[in-house]
């Protein structure tokens, strides 16, 4: 209902007579149409609505159409309606002399009221926050479709209405998406509800909700505390709310495993857009130590074929029984048959140092040296076994193994061969580098270097030289072993010192003794 200035003047006269006027008011609020029949005294001033009551006494005492007091009667108006085209001022009535006649709208207990008010151009409707002056004074309506945030905050921007909880309410459905699931909730609130505590506000030119496409949460519901914070995966979401005709946005960062609690009943939607969070699995590089039982057939440069079956256990006290059978053809077209049985009890002690270990991958590289023969002489045969557990890690390790054992050998051979190989090795993360050291024998020294994969098992290393005499029978004896040390710098840039076993000390004396015995035996046979 529009009240003109003339009608207001006549209403004062009617008020003096104690008469009243009955009016039906119709207005639209949030897409809903409200009607109400009001019976009031002609001089009725609607007060008690909080900060918007700027000069109720003025309207009660005077009917000046240019007074801001007339506007007081719409104090319950929510801020969805722009009150006027007036410039922002600091007073309800600057008294500039320039006035504007405007139809303003107010909401009271869920109903919208309209009234025609003539007010000063500098009139400021207080208590409603910042306003953008409108070019027209027609009621600004906000449809429900334009708001995708939670329930309309309030039908009364004042928040101090004397009639809150009067029974007039608005029911709103809130929708939110969380972790690929859609949740809905129905909220019923009083029409005078005021939504506060939303943080920074950014008024925009339109009331349409501003949303971010990447946001998994489309509602204004404030996320609760995560039940699994610190998982390392987070989602940043911009949530939007509409308040008093303005759109406010807020940025929230939450953990990807966030659980939305305290929101009441939830109804997962039938269509669920799955939101998957890809995780990069870091496989474990820790491997169990490898204990290998290997059988290898290897042909040497001197056409030697050997078959070795060995069972070893690294980084522990191990007992190994090795049986080796070899059939050889020498460069002098002589054949030899050697049957060797060695019993070895080996105590391996591995001392490892590493800066940072990320894996434990053990492999055993073993070098076996069998036979130490001299042509036409009875000699000793020794078996040297060096077992080094090789560990692969991100920081190269240096391992040292000192084997100790005794060996007894009986051989018949027409081929003179002196072989001794001791392996000193270390590895990087993918390869092992081994240096085979052979002591000087009869003025000749033999060495060999090789690089191999850390998983390989080397069963036999030997150096051979041709024989120059006929067959001889060898006596069984023991050889004093002297420990020497060989140092080398390998591919990983670290130096390694590995104790070695050299088997030739005292060999000359034994050979001499064997030669004398053989000569006596031969003389006896010839004599017979």
From Swiss-Prot:
Keywords: ATP-binding, Cell wall, Glycoprotein, GPI-anchor, Ion transport, Iron, Iron transport, Lipoprotein, Membrane, Nucleotide-binding, Repeat, Secreted, Signal, Transport. It comes from the Eukaryota. Residues 298-388, 398-435, 462-471 have a biased composition (Low complexity). Residues 81-93, 145-163, 446-457 have a biased composition (Polar residues). Residues 1-18 form the signal peptide. The GPI-anchor is attached to the protein in the endoplasmic reticulum and serves to target the protein to the cell surface. There, the glucosamine-inositol phospholipid moiety is cleaved off and the GPI-modified mannoprotein is covalently attached via its lipidless GPI glycan remnant to the 1,6-beta-glucan of the outer cell wall layer. Transmembrane segments: none annotated. GO terms for molecular function: ATP binding. Residues 79-100, 145-172, 214-234, 298-471 are annotated as: Disordered. It is a lipid-anchor; GPI-anchor. A lipid is attached at residue 506 (GPI-anchor amidated glycine). ATP binds at residues 488-495. Involved in the uptake of non-siderophore sources of iron and the siderophores ferrioxamine B and ferrichrome. Has a role in the retention of iron in the cell wall and periplasmic space. This is Facilitator of iron transport 1. It comes from Saccharomyces cerevisiae (strain ATCC 204508 / S288c).
């Amino acid at each position: 209902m529009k009240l003109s200035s003339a009608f207001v003047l006549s209403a004062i006269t009617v008020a003096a007579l104690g008469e009243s006027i009955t009016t039906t008011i119709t207005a639209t609020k949030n897409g809903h149409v409200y009607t109400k029949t009001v019976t009031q005294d002609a001089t009725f001033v609607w007060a008690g609505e909080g900060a918007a009551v700027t000069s109720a006494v003025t309207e009660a005492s005077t009917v000046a159409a240019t007074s801001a007091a007339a506007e007081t009667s719409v104090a319950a108006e929510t801020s969805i309606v722009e009150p006027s085209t007036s410039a922002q001022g600091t007073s309800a009535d600057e008294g500039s002399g320039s006035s504007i006649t405007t139809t303003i709208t107010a909401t009271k207990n869920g109903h919208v009221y309209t009234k025609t008010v003539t007010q000063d151009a500098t009139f400021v409707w207080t208590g409603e926050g910042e306003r953008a002056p409108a070019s027209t004074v027609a009621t600004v309506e906000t449809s429900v479709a334009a708001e995708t945030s939670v329930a309309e905050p309030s039908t009364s921007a004042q928040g101090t209405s004397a009639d809150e909880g009067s029974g007039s309410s608005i029911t709103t459905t809130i929708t939110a998406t969380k972790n690929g699931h859609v949740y809905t909730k129905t909220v019923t609130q009083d029409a005078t509800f005021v939504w506060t505590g939303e943080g920074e506000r950014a008024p925009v030119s339109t009331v349409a909700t501003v949303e971010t496409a990447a946001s998994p949460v489309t509602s204004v519901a404030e996320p609760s505390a995560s039940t699994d914070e610190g998982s390392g995966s987070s989602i940043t979401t911009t949530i939007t709310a509409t308040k008093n005709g303005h759109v406010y946005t807020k940025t929230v960062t939450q953990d990807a495993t966030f659980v939305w609690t305290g929101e009441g009943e939830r109804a997962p939607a039938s269509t669920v857009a799955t939101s998957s969070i890809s995780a990069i699995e870091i496989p474990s590089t820790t491997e169990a130590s490898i204990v290998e039982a290997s059988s290898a057939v290897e042909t040497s440069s001197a056409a030697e074929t050997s078959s070795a079956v060995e069972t070893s256990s690294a980084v522990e006290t191990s007992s190994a029984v090795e049986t080796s059978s070899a059939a050889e053809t020498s460069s002098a077209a002589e054949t030899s048959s050697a049957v060797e049985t060695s019993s070895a009890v080996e105590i391996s002690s591995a001392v490892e140092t590493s800066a940072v270990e990320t894996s434990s991958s053990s492999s055993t590289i073993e070098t076996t040296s069998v036979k130490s023969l001299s042509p036409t002489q009875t000699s000793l045969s020794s078996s040297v076994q060096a077992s080094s557990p090789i560990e692969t890690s991100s920081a190269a390790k240096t391992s040292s193994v000192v084997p100790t054992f005794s060996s007894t050998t009986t051989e018949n051979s027409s081929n003179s061969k002196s072989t001794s190989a001791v392996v000193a090795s270390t590895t990087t993360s993918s390869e092992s580098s081994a240096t085979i050291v052979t002591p000087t024998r009869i003025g000749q020294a033999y060495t060999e270097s090789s690089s191999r994969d850390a998983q390989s098992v080397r069963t036999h290393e030997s150096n051979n030289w041709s024989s120059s005499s006929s067959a001889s029978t060898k006596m069984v004896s023991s050889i004093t072993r002297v420990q020497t040390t060989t140092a080398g710098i390998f591919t990983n840039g670290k130096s390694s010192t590995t104790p070695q076993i050299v088997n030739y000390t005292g060999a000359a004396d034994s050979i001499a003794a064997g030669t004398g015995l053989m000569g006596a035996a031969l003389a006896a046979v010839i004599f017979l």
